[in-house]
């Protein structure tokens, strides 16, 4: 090309300069430049490595260049006509590129740096997740250890309460002593530590039922012996009154009771005007007899409370004893001397006392032979069933067991529980003052709520 033609050739337009500047800015971005360089190197390496692919790519490049040249030649008039609009678009694109560079600083960094930073972020995130997982595992281990310690404390406290309130029986002590004689046998505490929670809980429940049964049976034996003692003294009193009415000197038994002691003391007193006053001794004897009957009445009440939940045959035995005591008490109510008590009443009373003595023996045999029933909770639940309202010293009793007040017992409302039970079974109506018209039959399996620490 000559110098004249070069001088006459038109220079690049303003749009081309702006367009070139925009393209240069985009191409000058480090991330774009590094990425394009990496792609170009990979493209060139692929062409050199595969000759056939290289020939095809060179042919495609030649075609694309021809098409681009022809497209630019045909689009040149249109681009010249739209030069102001394209300049405005270019300016807006430059402004958007400025904002994009501010929001995305990694555009000013090479691709290697961006990849390295991304790897660092991913590694940091993975490390954080691993740390959280380890921390969660550590928390779970600590929680498991805390729950295990809490279970140990609860079981140890329950076992201490059982050992304190229900001591070991003679059979258990003998079995424990026999086990201790064997080789390499640890103590009870060591054996409990090596047992699982469910094994310890099951053995504790079984032992609690057995000890509660033995404890209740022991209480029933005590009441039985006390009732028989009262019946024997009343039998001696009736025999003494019968002999005195017949004019026979009473015979002192081998083990004299209160009545015979009273008459021996009276016989040793000095004479008054050469005779003794029988009326005073008879009055004191009758008063003593009424006291024995009242004491026997309270013992029968305790027996009746203890046999709730047992078969009807056992309850009938206690009811027969109560009827005998009530009949004898009615006969002695207004008597002031022996003559006020009819001989027929004395004879019937002696027979009733003998039958009552036999009934008490049969009652204990029924309890021992029967399978332990809902009364296994022994002296706890029947008291709650019998009382229409909480006892006045309930808080003191609870504090004595657990060592302090506890809000868990704020919901214990015996009248409300009784009314709910009546409404559920549809038996009886409740009068004003929360007093039932008829005493409802207690549930067949009353639940002990006085000592929640022993509820399993």
UniProtKB/Swiss-Prot annotation:
Cross-referenced InterPro entries: Perilipin (IPR004279)
A GO biological process held by the record: positive regulation of lipase activity
Subcellular location: Lipid droplet; Cytoplasm; Mitochondrion
Keyword Chaperone recorded: no
Region: Recruits mitochondria at the lipid droplet surface, residue numbers: 438-456
Post-translational modification: Phosphorylated by PKA. Phosphorylated on serine in skeletal muscle at rest or upon lipolytic stimulation.
Pfam families xref list: Perilipin
Coiled coil regions, renumbered to chain: none
Modification sites for Phosphoserine: 2, 148, 324
Residue segments, region Disordered: 418-456
Residue ranges of the region described as Essential for lipid droplet targeting: 1-173
Region Interaction with LIPE: start-end pairs: 1-108
Family annotation (Gene3D superfamilies): Flagellar protein FliS, Perilipin, alpha-beta domain
SUPFAM superfamilies assigned: Mannose-6-phosphate receptor binding protein 1 (Tip47), C-terminal domain (SSF109775)
Function description: Lipid droplet-associated protein that maintains the balance between lipogenesis and lipolysis and also regulates fatty acid oxidation in oxidative tissues. Recruits mitochondria to the surface of lipid droplets and is involved in lipid droplet homeostasis by regulating both the storage of fatty acids in the form of triglycerides and the release of fatty acids for mitochondrial fatty acid oxidation. In lipid droplet triacylglycerol hydrolysis, plays a role as a scaffolding protein for three major key lipolytic players: ABHD5, PNPLA2 and LIPE.
Family in the record: Belongs to the perilipin family.
Name of the protein in question: Perilipin-5
Naturally occurring in which organism (per UniProt): Bos taurus
Lineage: Eukaryota, Metazoa, Chordata, Craniata, Vertebrata
Gene: PLIN5
């Amino acid at each position: 090309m000559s110098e004249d033609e070069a001088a006459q050739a038109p220079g690049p337009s303003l749009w081309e300069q702006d367009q070139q500047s925009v393209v240069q800015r985009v191409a000058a971005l480090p991330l774009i430049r590094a990425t394009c360089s990496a792609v170009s190197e990979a493209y060139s390496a692929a062409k050199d490595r595969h000759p056939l692919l290289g020939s095809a790519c060179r042919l495609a490049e030649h075609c694309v260049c021809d098409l681009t040249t022809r497209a630019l030649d045909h689009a040149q008039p249109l681009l010249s006509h739209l030069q102001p609009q394209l300049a405005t678009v270019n300016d807006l694109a430059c402004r958007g590129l400025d904002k994009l560079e501010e929001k995305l600083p990694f555009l000013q960094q090479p691709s290697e740096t961006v990849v390295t930073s991304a790897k660092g972020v991913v590694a940091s995130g993975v490390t954080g997740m691993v740390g959280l997982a380890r921390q969660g595992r550590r928390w779970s281990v600590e929680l498991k250890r805390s729950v295990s310690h809490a279970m140990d404390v609860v079981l140890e406290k329950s076992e201490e309460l059982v050992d304190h309130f229900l001591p070991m029986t003679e059979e258990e002590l003998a079995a424990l002593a026999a086990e201790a004689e064997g080789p390499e046998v640890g103590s009870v505490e060591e054996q409990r530590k090596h047992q699982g929670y469910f094994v310890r809980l099951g053995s504790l429940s079984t032992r609690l039922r057995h000890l509660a049964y033995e404890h209740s049976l022991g209480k029933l034996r005590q009441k039985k012996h006390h009732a028989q003692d009262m019946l024997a003294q009343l039998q001696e009193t009736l025999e003494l009154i019968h002999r005195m009415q017949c004019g026979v000197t009473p015979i002192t038994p081998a083990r004299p009771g209160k009545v015979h002691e009273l008459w021996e003391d009276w016989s040793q007193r000095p004479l008054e005007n050469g005779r003794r006053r029988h009326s005073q001794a008879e009055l004191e004897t009758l008063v003593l007899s009424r006291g024995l009957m009242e004491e026997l009445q309270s013992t029968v009440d305790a027996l009746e409370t203890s046999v709730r939940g047992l078969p009807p045959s056992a309850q009938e035995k206690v009811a027969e004893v109560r009827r005998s005591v009530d009949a004898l008490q009615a006969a002695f109510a207004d008597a002031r001397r022996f003559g006020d008590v009819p001989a027929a009443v004395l004879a019937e009373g002696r027979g009733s006392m003998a039958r009552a003595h036999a009934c008490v023996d049969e009652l204990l045999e029924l309890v021992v032979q029967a399978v332990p029933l809902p009364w296994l909770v022994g002296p706890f639940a029947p008291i709650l069933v019998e009382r229409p309202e909480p006892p006045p010293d309930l808080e003191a009793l609870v504090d004595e067991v657990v060592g302090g007040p506890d809000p868990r017992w704020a919901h214990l409302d015996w009248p409300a529980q009784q009314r709910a039970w009546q409404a559920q079974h549809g038996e009886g109506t409740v009068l004003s003052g929360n007093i039932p018209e008829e005493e409802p039959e207690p549930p067949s399996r009353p639940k002990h709520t006085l000592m929640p620490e022993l509820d399993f």
